[in-house]
Amino acid sequence: LEGVADLAISGYSIPGHLGTEMSSVEFVAVAHPDHALHQANRELTFQDLESQLQVVIRDSGRQQPRDVGWLGAEQRWTVGSLGTATTFVSNGLGFAWLPRHMIERELREGLLKPLPLDKGGNRNPTFYLYSSKDRPLGPATQILIDLIRTFDTAPLTTALTAPQHA
């Protein structure tokens, strides 16, 4: 957090900070149905993925940034958002691990298809909510924390309404 952010949500444990555990998110390895990986018509291995273009999401961390989910594939494109990755992969450019809840429409419409991996086709990282330990949180930030906690486990179809404060 480095004194820059009041709140952070991360899939990583941040050394020196105590995070509040939130939900896990299912990430699915996917590619367009016409992608070469789907043409093998068999269970895929890590070696099959190494020679293919992998689309990875740039980590926004300032120290030790990581390309999230990168396998070390020979070719990779690093993009700035999950939406961009979804657009690239659903148009036939590479493969990626993407959050299932964000790609349900593409899966349903046949723009994306889960890769038949022998292992690791689904990942379920747990996310953590961190708040600044360097300064007290203001009322607006506390309301945001309450909203995040309230809707963290709510179905995506839940209407968003602010929590009631006494």
Model regions and ranges:
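Short, Asp-centered acidic motifs that coordinate Mg2+ and/or phosphate
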Residues: 2, 6-7, 95
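Short, charged alpha-helical segments
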Residues: 124, 136-139, 143-146
